[in-house]
């Protein structure tokens, strides 16, 4: 399963660890992903999404129906 938020599209970023001596070693910055079930009243079913904490805040703000419409418009199957 890929580490990509289904709402925001955030994915792992790359950068460097820096030691006290400023030596650089490559690392990945992973998104804060959670698997969460949402009840969709209009469909009378649960929908499971893999999303970041920011994605959950977006759903709280816009509503699950609006967010699902955007995801389906992108062509993702839910």
Curated annotation (Swiss-Prot):
GO cellular component: cytosolic large ribosomal subunit
Keyword NAD: no
Ribonucleoprotein as UniProt keyword: yes
Origin: domain of life: Bacteria
Keyword tags: Ribonucleoprotein, Ribosomal protein
Pfam family, one: Ribosomal_L28
GO molecular function: structural constituent of ribosome
A GO biological process held by the record: translation
Similarity comment: Belongs to the bacterial ribosomal protein bL28 family.
NCBIfam families: L28
Name by which UniProt lists this protein: Large ribosomal subunit protein bL28
Species of origin: Histophilus somni (strain 2336) (Haemophilus somnus)
């Amino acid at each position: 399963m890929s580490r990509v938020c289904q709402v925001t599209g955030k994915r792992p970023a790359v950068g460097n660890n820096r030691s006290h001596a400023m030596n650089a070693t490559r690392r990945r910055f992973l998104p804060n992903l959670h698997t969460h079930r949402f009840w969709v009243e209009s469909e009378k079913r649960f929908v499971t999404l893999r999303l970041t904490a920011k994605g959950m805040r977006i759903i709280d703000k816009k509503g699950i129906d609006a967010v699902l419409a955007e995801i389906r418009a992108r062509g993702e199957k839910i």
